[in-house]
């Protein structure tokens, strides 16, 4: 795994700016502690920082083609590179290395951009073709690896992280209020947004073609992989592919099915070394770590269980600098990566299993809502409209109470994107904006988040399937994979996700939602198929996970930071939020019913830290956060 950055410029001046490229590379040096390199040629500057996983001795980048006419800066792993290499060698292509990077160049020189559809893996790369004066930015169809872009045909900048672009003298860091509004509602950035004005993401499965004369084209592509008929066979193939490395590979292990399945399959495939797994003992409930320990014992693998005491006052600013977006549940991801990075360079994660097999409560809730809408189509709306309005007048004066949210869900049955938004705590409406936001937000032209959701909502008649498709395209990519990439790379660890493998997903998608989740039972088919591999004890465990109760967490750990970052003076100075809302919540006793409100407070606090780091250019290491 690595980091890439650079630019394409119509003017031939790139060779005069090595210091600029070095500054951009320095911002992402944590992504590649094992080496770095630069390439300049006419209109192009390519930078690379390397974490060595495959071809440790000759895989340095940026990498030139054998004829010196093409150059690539690549972040990721190609799991089928050996198979592709053999095929290309048979056609006479001369290779100089044993790396997966050179295979990408060979595919391009042999097949053009059509060759990219043969790649199996996680990747984002920039490729320059001197012959045609064309450059390409490419991101994998699953969106596992990030790629940010800014600019236009005159000058297009890119980077594995937005901070690399911000290091270019042509850009300055400024918060995008509309993106912050999306973040406050979705708790991640859907679509191609970033939190910085003028910087966007290249969306998954896209090729951005830049040409010195003809301009920029955005080209969609997908992976050419045949769907199998057997999910277990496809899963075994995926895990086997994800063990491709010239270094030892470990596994994350929680108490659930997904990571246990990867460990069980990985143990069968790992013959040169004993498989190691890693578990974080933290959170509100130790049951998750206890279950992971039992899974490791049953599977016969080494488990490193690390008990960690939270000290957000020390690690939150650094975490935010890496994430570039305020996030609520990223601390445990970084702490687990730190544990694993002490032993291995690569870890496999069970991320994506719940998305593939309908494993979340929100899938079950949508199934129940769909059933209710068919049983009581007219009565439901009349009841919610008449009785609901009367009850709401007697509810808490706090905005967005749990009871009002449930009534809104019932009232909205049939409007499935809105129902989903309410289930996921999207709150956007004019009255709440006035309660929550300050003048800098209220004076901006903010997008209606429910309309944004409706515009992105898949056109599937089954609302549960539509929900799953939406979360695969947006929440998985821009929330879960985003956090996994940033927190692991901050620790010099590569994390791989077999459940997000394209050939595996194509096999799973041969089965419809009713087969994967019969009668609304989450992960039903997966449990049936994986029972022989894992046994009854693991399969029958209730779903748990690392949970942080936001009111308790905020009061226990963040109260000191709140005194520094959520003061009326600072809130007024930044102008983003309403100090009356903040003070009202801080004065209340922590309670479960305030969970939403404290999530909002947490995001507000981190947004203020974000402003100081990225807009005011304060080094996060200088923050005096300790009590």
Feature map (PLM): residue ranges:
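ATP-dependent adenylate-handling active sites, centered on carboxylate activation for C-N bond formation
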Residues: 8-16, 90, 131-156, 224-445, ...
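PAPS-dependent sulfotransferase catalytic core
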Residues: 534-592
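Structural motif
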Residues: 91-99, 170, 174-177, 458-471, ...
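Short Ser/Thr-interspersed hydrophobic loop/turn segments at strand-loop and sheet-helix junctions
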Residues: 47-57, 141, 245, 471-486, ...
């Amino acid at each position: 795994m690595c980091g890439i950055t650079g630019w394409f410029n119509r003017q031939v001046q790139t060779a005069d700016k090595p210091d600029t490229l070095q500054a951009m590379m320095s911002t992402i040096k944590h992504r590649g502690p094992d080496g770095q390199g630069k390439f300049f040629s006419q209109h192009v500057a390519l930078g690379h920082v390397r974490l060595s996983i495959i071809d440790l001795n000759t895989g340095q980048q940026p990498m030139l083609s054998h004829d010196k006419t093409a150059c690539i800066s690549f972040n990721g792993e190609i799991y089928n590179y050996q198979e592709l290499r053999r095929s290309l060698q048979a056609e006479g292509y001369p290779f100089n290395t044993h790396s997966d990077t050179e295979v990408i160049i060979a595919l391009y020189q042999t097949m053009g951009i059509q060759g990219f559809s043969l790649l199996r893996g996680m990747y984002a790369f920039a490729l320059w073709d001197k012959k045609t004066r064309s450059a390409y930015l490419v991101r994998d169809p699953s969106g596992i690896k990030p790629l940010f872009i800014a600019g236009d045909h005159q000058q297009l900048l890119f980077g594995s992280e937005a901070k690399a672009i911000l290091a270019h003298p042509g850009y300055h860091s400024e918060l995008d209020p509309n993106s912050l509004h999306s973040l406050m509602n979705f708790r991640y950035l859907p679509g191609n947004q970033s939190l910085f004005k003028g910087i966007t993401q290249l969306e998954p499965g896209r090729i951005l073609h830049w040409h010195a004369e003809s301009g920029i084209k955005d080209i969609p592509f997908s992976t050419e992989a045949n769907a199998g008929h057997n999910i277990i066979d496809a899963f075994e193939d995926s895990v086997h592919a994800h063990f491709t490395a010239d270094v030892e590979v470990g596994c994350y292990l929680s108490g659930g099915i997904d990571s246990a399945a990867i460990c069980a399959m990985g143990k069968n495939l790992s013959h040169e070394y004993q498989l190691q797994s890693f578990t974080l003992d933290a959170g509100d409930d130790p049951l998750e770590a206890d279950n992971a320990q039992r899974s490791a014992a049953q599977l016969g693998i080494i488990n490193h269980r690390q008990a960690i005491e939270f000290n957000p006052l020390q690690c939150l600013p650094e975490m935010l600098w890496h994430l570039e977006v305020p996030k609520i549940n990223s601390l445990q991801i970084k702490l687990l990566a730190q544990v694993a990075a002490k032993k291995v360079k690569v870890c496999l994660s069970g991320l994506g299993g719940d998305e593939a097999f309908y494993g979340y409560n929100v899938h079950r809730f949508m199934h129940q809502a769909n059933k209710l809408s068919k049983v009581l189509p007219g009565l439901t709306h009349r009841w919610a409209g008449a009785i609901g309005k009367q009850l709401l007048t007697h509810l808490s004066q706090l905005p967005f109470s749990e009871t009002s949210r449930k009534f809104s869900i019932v009232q909205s049955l049939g409007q499935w994107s809105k129902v989903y938004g309410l289930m996921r705590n999207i709150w956007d409406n004019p009255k709440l904006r006035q309660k929550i936001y300050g003048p800098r937000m209220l004076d901006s032209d903010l997008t209606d988040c429910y309309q944004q959701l409706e515009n992105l909502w898949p056109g599937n008649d089954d609302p549960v399937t539509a929900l799953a498709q939406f979360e695969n395209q947006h929440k998985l990519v821009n929330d879960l994979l985003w956090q996994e990439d940033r927190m692991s790379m901050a620790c010099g660890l590569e994390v791989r996700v077999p459940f997000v493998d394209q050939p595996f997903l194509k096999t799973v998608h041969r089965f419809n939602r009713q087969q994967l989740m019969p009668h609304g039972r989450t992960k039903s088919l997966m449990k049936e198929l994986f029972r022989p591999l894992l046994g009854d004890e693991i399969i029958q465990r209730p779903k748990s996970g690392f949970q942080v109760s936001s009111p308790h967490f905020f009061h226990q750990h963040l109260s000191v930071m709140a005194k520094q970052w959520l003061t009326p003076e600072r809130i007024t100075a930044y102008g983003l939020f309403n100090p009356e809302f903040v003070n009202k919540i801080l004065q209340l006793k922590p309670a479960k019913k305030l969970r939403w409100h404290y999530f909002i407070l947490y995001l507000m606090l981190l947004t203020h830290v974000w402003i100081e780091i990225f807009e005011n250019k304060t080094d996060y290491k200088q923050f005096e956060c300790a009590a």
